[in-house]
Curated annotation (Swiss-Prot):
Assembly description: Fourteen ClpP subunits assemble into 2 heptameric rings which stack back to back to give a disk-like structure with a central cavity, resembling the structure of eukaryotic proteasomes.
GO biological process, one term: protein quality control for misfolded or incompletely synthesized proteins
InterPro entries cross-referenced by the UniProt entry: ClpP, ClpP/crotonase-like_dom_sf, ClpP/TepA, ClpP_Ser_AS
Keywords recorded for this protein, A-Z: Cytoplasm, Hydrolase, Protease, Serine protease
Organism this protein belongs to: Coxiella burnetii (strain Dugway 5J108-111)
Enzyme class: hydrolase
Encoding gene, per UniProt annotation: clpP
Lineage: Bacteria, Pseudomonadati, Pseudomonadota, Gammaproteobacteria, Legionellales
Name listed for the protein in its UniProt record: ATP-dependent Clp protease proteolytic subunit
Amino acid sequence: MSVLVPMVVEQTSRGERAYDIYSRLLKDRVIFLVGQVEDHMANLAIAQMLFLESENPNKDINLYINSPGGAVTSAMAIYDTMQFVKPDVRTLCIGQAASAGALLLAGGAKGKRHCLPHSSVMIHQVLGGYQGQGTDIQIHAKQTQRVSDQLNQILAKHTGKDIERVEKDTNRDYFLTPEEAVEYGLIDSIFTERP
């Protein structure tokens, strides 16, 4: 099923110019991460962040997140780019930021991580399902544990929680209201109106 993307028409000195809504918002330094985090989405988000950095390395990038999570490698590529680019990346949860989405939400610039009032945040451990020979399963289990440890370290760094607390909380699905996400350190504030 194809999705129609709304168009926006702007008046310029040279006439009218039509943009799809996401391209128009990109001009205002807004990037949307919506749906499953996967390689294609990650490549688009990374390209947009790099483009915005080249346009103005001193102006914040706004990352709007509404995601149930997805592939850890894709999320880590986005996260690493968020940390790499010179502009601060402001994050805003609109709807949900679960799993990989919560990691990206927390990975925004300190003091610039936000939720809307009826959003939901969820953290948990890395999920994996493997089959095959026993030795292959052991290899994948070690890798899953290594990545899980890495993600817990990142969450501990951005929340200020000790690693033992993060490991305990991510052992199962851990849902947080925006107020709880502020208290936990995943975000800094809740937007009830435009700042």
